Amino acid sequence: MYTGNQLRDMFLNFFASKGHRILPSASLIPKDDPTLLLTVAGMVPFKPYFMRKVEPPFPRATTSQKCVRTPDLEVVGKTARHHTFFEMLGNFSFGDYFKAEAIPWAWEFVTEVLKLPIDQLWITVHPEDEEAKNLWIEKTGVSPERIKYDPENLWAAGPVGPCGYCSEIYVDLGESRGCGKPDCALGCDCDRFLEIWNLVFMQYNRDEAGLLTPLPKQNIDTGMGLERIASVMQGAASNFDTDLFLPIINKVAELSGIPYHDSPKNDVAMKVVADHTRAVSFMLSDGIRPGSEGRGYVLRRILRRAIRYARLLGIDKPFLEQIFLIIQKDYSHHYPELKENENFILNHLRLEEKNFQATLEQGTQILQDKVKTLQEAGETMLSGADAFYLYETYGFPVELTEEMLIEQGMSVDMETFNAAAEEHRRLAKEQSQQMKAVQESAAISEKAKALGTTPFLGYHELAAHTKVEALFRDGEEVKDAAEGDEVLIFLRESPFYAESGGQISDSGVIRSLRAEAKLIEVKKGVTGTVYHRFLLTQGVLHTGDEVEALVDEHLRLATARHHSATHLLQAALRAVLGEHVQQAGSLVTPDRLRFDFTHFSALTSAELQRVEDLLNEAVLANMPVAAEEMSLDAAKASGATALFGEKYGDTVRVVSMGDYSLELCGGTHIRATGDIGLVKIISEGGIGAGLRRIEAVAGAEALKYMRSLNDQILDAAQLLKAQPSDLLKRIQGLLVQVKDLEKEVQQLNAKVAKSEVESLLQQVKDVEGVPVLAAKVSAQDMDTLRNTADLLKDKMKDGVLVLGAAVEGKVNWVTVVTPVGLRGLHAGQIIKEVAKITGGGGGGRPDMAQAGGKDAAKLGEALDQVPAIIKSHIK
């Protein structure tokens, strides 16, 4: 019996013998592919080769590619084959060989290497792909009766991009695995016939409209799921019963104290925990961090689902670390990133688990209260607003809300949830400012491909004589552009730095004999072509014009200071906090720097001061700054720091600052650290779980910042009539006075409330035998309003209180029902209806609830409605 590791090696070595280069798995983060959040298939890393956007460096390749897919998340663990993370074995041809070679090689591997019986194998082809059918018969000797047509045999990795007809190999697992129906055959929905290999004949490109156009060259892309073929070769009932999963499942069983195969329900939970923890481990190992959007949200959702199912097994203590160590042991020989990034993975697992346990407990309690309320009202659907409140306020995933409600025979109103979420996104989008992205039309893309890489002169020159190779306006190529036009320009070579690695693009101008244009932004495409966006400020510019390209030297130098300071900052952070610190993002501009990094607690004042001291000591040392190109292997051997999760080419640029800092970097820098001048940290804070952010200023901007602080101190001293040296003592004295005055105000408010109580008690009305007091009171905040309610409650003993207070045009509401459950009355339900009249909402417990309203003008109207509202709720 072959192990999963042996099967992986057998596949790769077989295709190496056929002239394929064995490549390591690409990252789960697709490179330069905005159409995909995650790597979902083996061919994804090779899409630029299939599309010929980049010339393939080799004609053939074979990989075992890490993949993550989540559309079928809810059925993972309930079927034999569905997973979130899986390994896709594949062989690829980039315009080299095609069907005539791919088909017999696949047959050779399946029948001669794996030695699967021919009489158990079946083939499918597309009805319009007679060529493939004939090749199966001619090249392998497969009987025509064992080849079936399948109109679904058209494959693609996404909605747009390379695609083609495909041919699939199935294995018949035997009648014992089937449905037992007399007509059970290939195509039946049962588990008898298992697809083990998909051969994709990549011939077309599908666009946004669904139109297919032939690719420049024909390609081969095949995919064999390692987990599936392992289940076949090991005679396992499911993928989960192979050696790829059993060690993980056995650990889950050990932690839960429940044997595997104890019950179908527990088995599903164990499989979910094993599958999801494996997926999370690999996603973290590639630098994906848990977050609230994009692939970070996918990771967090999978992780939280694992924790939820572990709790169903009785595992209520942290466990993810123990499961990860099993995964690391079994997989790190082929995926060393699981070992190399162990600290990063474990830190995030611990933090996410800790945070979600608290979220789960809090959110579950709130949801249970809402379920109880629904049950009491005879309803089965939770409002989308309530579900969004759980998600937005407590981070409680709506998917988890849905699952927990399904267990209670209930559901979520997803239409109103999505509406609330969309409104939230709309508001967030309005509040954010995003840089205008380069919009590539097909014509622009083709031109970029034809021009290829744009030589960058800006490391050594800030002015260059170059030529306008092409002009585009509104996505269309034009021969000339006039004053006022905004255009995209391709230059023969460029001194302008293209936005990359967190450093913003250069500013500057180009000048010809007849025109001048101001640079707006610079970006680099996947082909290495540099896109320049200019605004024509004078004259007419033509394609073919010779121009002078001039970088804004002042802004370039200011940016370089901040970029070099960022390198020193990372080195200082690692020295003070530890080697676990890794860059998670950055922004480098002429006036500031922003550095995001991994660390799991706020920096103390002493740590922050030490980091700043080390930074400026490195500046004062005036160390030389040098850049050198070398192979990626040589850079790694030198100990150069790389951006975690980033995929680099074979040749990289390494920037050194004396013996203090060594990083892979393509940005621009000063010549010596002394050129930075001064670095001042202006803020440090958290931006997410396990992520911190430091903002700092350097050079002239640091001086400007320090002057501003000094001016504020002098202004404050003058305002408080104190010397700057006495300012702190003066402020402390004022704070004591303010605290004393606030105490006096509270005491006065309490006296006012007490004096109001007696007169308010005279307003109590009888509503079908229930004492009801609905009144407007003069409370300036919610605390005072609650105190007034408490005083009235003590006096009334039993009944209902509904108190409203107008504060700056809005309304605060408090409702009390005493004793709890009086005549079936629920304070939260009452206040919800009352507050609605004033344009607000709220809720709370059966005995006490509070709410807000937007329109104080309707306070009286709302109070008038209280008796009728209470009457409608009396049971």
Swiss-Prot record:
Q: How is the cofactor bound?
A: Binds 1 zinc ion per subunit.
Q: What is its EC number?
A: 6.1.1.7
Task: Determine the domain of life of the protein's source.
Answer: Bacteria
Question: Which GO MF term does the entry hold, naming one?
Answer: aminoacyl-tRNA deacylase activity
**Chemical reaction(s) catalysed:** tRNA(Ala) + L-alanine + ATP = L-alanyl-tRNA(Ala) + AMP + diphosphate
Q: Name one GO cellular component term.
A: cytosol
Binding-site list for Zn(2+): 563, 567, 665, 669
Q: Does the keyword rRNA processing apply?
A: no
According to its UniProt entry, the protein's GO biological process terms are:
alanyl-tRNA aminoacylation
Cofactor dependence is on:
Zn(2+)
User: What does the UniProt keyword field contain?
Assistant: Aminoacyl-tRNA synthetase, ATP-binding, Cytoplasm, Ligase, Metal-binding, Nucleotide-binding, Protein biosynthesis, RNA-binding, tRNA-binding, Zinc
SUPFAM superfamilies from the UniProt entry: Class II aaRS and biotin synthetases (SSF55681), Putative anticodon-binding domain of alanyl-tRNA synthetase (AlaRS) (SSF101353), ThrRS/AlaRS common domain (SSF55186), Translation proteins (SSF50447)
Q: What is its subcellular localisation? A: Cytoplasm
Function, please?
Catalyzes the attachment of alanine to tRNA(Ala) in a two-step reaction: alanine is first activated by ATP to form Ala-AMP and then transferred to the acceptor end of tRNA(Ala). Also edits incorrectly charged Ser-tRNA(Ala) and Gly-tRNA(Ala) via its editing domain.
Q: What information about domains appears in the record's comments? A: Consists of three domains; the N-terminal catalytic domain, the editing domain and the C-terminal C-Ala domain. The editing domain removes incorrectly charged amino acids, while the C-Ala domain, along with tRNA(Ala), serves as a bridge to cooperatively bring together the editing and aminoacylation centers thus stimulating deacylation of misacylated tRNAs.
The record, for HAMAP family, names:
Ala_tRNA_synth_B
| PANTHER family hit by this protein | ALANINE--TRNA LIGASE, CYTOPLASMIC, ALANYL-TRNA SYNTHETASE
Q: Which family does it belong to?
A: Belongs to the class-II aminoacyl-tRNA synthetase family.
Query: What is the protein name given in its UniProt record?
Result: Alanine--tRNA ligase
This chain's source organism reads Desulfitobacterium hafniense (strain Y51)
